[in-house]
């Protein structure tokens, strides 16, 4: 699981899910990638589930890059608790993903294998996403 080792503050404000991604919109490391088409909070468990789905499908060949990191805590109050008395305890770690962001990349496998592996990973994510190819020559 991806979790920060140390954080300056244990609890943070919720990040905004508006606007487009400023950077990280191109496939830079691999040959194929998953690009977000809608905003979402992606938890560390969802990132890990997508990674496992991809690596199991490509077996021993290929390489996978994860371009997002869950660096923000999301808090939750216990069930049946009255309102007030402070903010809840940190429950999950999330990455704030905006539309256009390339989240995962893959290379070293054929087009059919890459597309199927990325399709399996997209089903593990909480937003609309598409498969994109690297632009330009090698």
UniProtKB/Swiss-Prot annotation:
The gene is rplP. It comes from the Bacteria. InterPro entries: Ribosomal_uL16 (IPR047873), Ribosomal_uL16_bact-type (IPR000114), Ribosomal_uL16_CS (IPR020798), Ribosomal_uL16_dom (IPR016180), Ribosomal_uL16_sf (IPR036920). It holds the Pfam family Ribosomal_L16. NCBIfam families: rplP_bact. One of its GO terms (biological process) is translation. This is Large ribosomal subunit protein uL16. Residues 1-20 have a biased composition (Basic residues). GO terms for molecular function: rRNA binding; structural constituent of ribosome; tRNA binding. It comes from Kocuria rhizophila (strain ATCC 9341 / DSM 348 / NBRC 103217 / DC2201). Residues 1-24 are annotated as: Disordered. One of its GO terms (cellular component) is cytosolic large ribosomal subunit. The lineage of its organism: Bacteria, Bacillati, Actinomycetota, Actinomycetes, Micrococcales. Part of the 50S ribosomal subunit. Binds 23S rRNA and is also seen to make contacts with the A and possibly P site tRNAs. PANTHER family: 50S/60S RIBOSOMAL PROTEIN L16, LARGE RIBOSOMAL SUBUNIT PROTEIN UL16M. Keywords: Ribonucleoprotein, Ribosomal protein, RNA-binding, rRNA-binding, tRNA-binding. Belongs to the universal ribosomal protein uL16 family.
């Amino acid at each position: 699981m991806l979790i920060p080792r140390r954080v300056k503050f244990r609890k943070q404000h919720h990040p905004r899910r508006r606007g487009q991604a400023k950077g990280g919109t191109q496939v830079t490391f691999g040959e194929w990638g998953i690009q977000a088409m809608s905003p979402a909070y992606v938890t560390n468990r969802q990132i890990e589930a997508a990674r496992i789905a991809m690596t199991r499908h490509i077996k021993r060949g290929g390489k996978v890059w994860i371009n997002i990191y869950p660096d923000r805590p999301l808090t939750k109050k216990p069930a049946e608790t009255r309102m007030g008395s402070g903010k809840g305890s940190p429950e999950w770690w999330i990455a704030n993903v905006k539309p256009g962001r390339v989240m995962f990349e893959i290379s070293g496998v054929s087009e059919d294998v890459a597309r199927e592996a990325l399709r399996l990973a997209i089903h593990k994510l909480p937003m609309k996403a598409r498969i994109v190819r690297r632009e330009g020559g090698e």
